[in-house]
């Protein structure tokens, strides 16, 4: 049957290149249901709560502070080795529409454990809403994607195989999910060593989380421990930060608002 040939757009070409780069990574998966009731209660109090991508990015990076293996990548050049990075680099999958075509682009958040949760969320939202030219990570990957195939292949080989560049280009872990589109179990692919995906939070306070990892770097025992640590961090450090944001919201509501051009007291108490 005769069809129509269509040109591959740059965002789609990026996915093609990513899948080629991911095909040699021996991924293994482990899924678990986490009880995050305390986190959900704290988040539910906020008028503008941070998204779950930001929450999981920061929580995983906090766990990785004391687990160097979660900041380790496998590299082939100049010889096969493990390369440990000093801090986490999260690659968050951003779903957006470019020229009428749905696409997914990775936003880099460097050291999310060192940033306020609101800042992590701001970086993710900026990547979703701003033009591609205004997002540094997008500009970087789009420049590589527009290269002719021989040069593009060389750039990918350098990024994949040199230890330092692998961390710079693909991060130490990725965060993705389809919770915003109804949820489901997502077995994603990435050249990076770890991929965390999450489902929709359930009314009973649980959420299904999957971690896929490069089996060359670690084994299932560590990942099983990571789930327990992740659950604890979500319900303690992250929940505490969310409650702090609620306190800030309440304080802002109680503060008087100055009316422009008003005389006398010039305030309206809210």
Features from the language model and the residues they span:
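C-terminal catalytic/motor cores of large multi-domain enzyme assemblies
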Residues: 1-270
């Amino acid at each position: 049957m005769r069809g129509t040939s269509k040109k591959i757009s740059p965002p789609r070409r990026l996915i093609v290149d990513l899948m080629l780069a991911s095909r040699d990574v021996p991924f293994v998966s482990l899924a678990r249901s986490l009880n995050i009731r305390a986190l959900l209660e704290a988040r539910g109090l906020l008028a503008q709560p941070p998204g779950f991508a930001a929450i999981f990015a920061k929580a995983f990076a906090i766990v990785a502070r004391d687990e160097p293996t979660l900041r380790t990548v496998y590299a082939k050049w100049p010889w096969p080795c493990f390369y440990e990075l000093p801090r986490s680099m999260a690659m968050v999958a951003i779903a957006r529409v470019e020229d009428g075509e749905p696409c997914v682009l990775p936003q880099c958040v460097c050291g999310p454990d060192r940033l306020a949760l609101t800042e992590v969320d701001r970086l993710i939202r900026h990547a979703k809403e701003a033009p591609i030219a205004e997002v540094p990570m997008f500009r970087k990957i789009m420049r590589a994607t527009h290269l002719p195939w021989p040069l593009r292949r060389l750039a990918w080989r350098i990024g994949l195989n040199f230890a330092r560049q692998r961390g710079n280009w693909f991060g130490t872990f990725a965060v993705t999910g389809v919770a915003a589109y109804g949820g489901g179990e997502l077995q994603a692919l990435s050249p990076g060593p770890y991929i965390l995906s999450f489902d929709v939070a359930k009314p009973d306070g649980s959420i299904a989380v999957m971690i896929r990892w490069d089996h060359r770097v670690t084994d299932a025992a560590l990942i099983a421990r990571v789930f327990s640590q992740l659950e604890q961090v979500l319900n303690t450090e992250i929940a505490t930060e969310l409650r702090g944001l609620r306190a800030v919201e309440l304080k802002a509501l109680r503060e008087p608002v100055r009316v422009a051009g008003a005389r006398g007291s010039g305030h309206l108490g809210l």
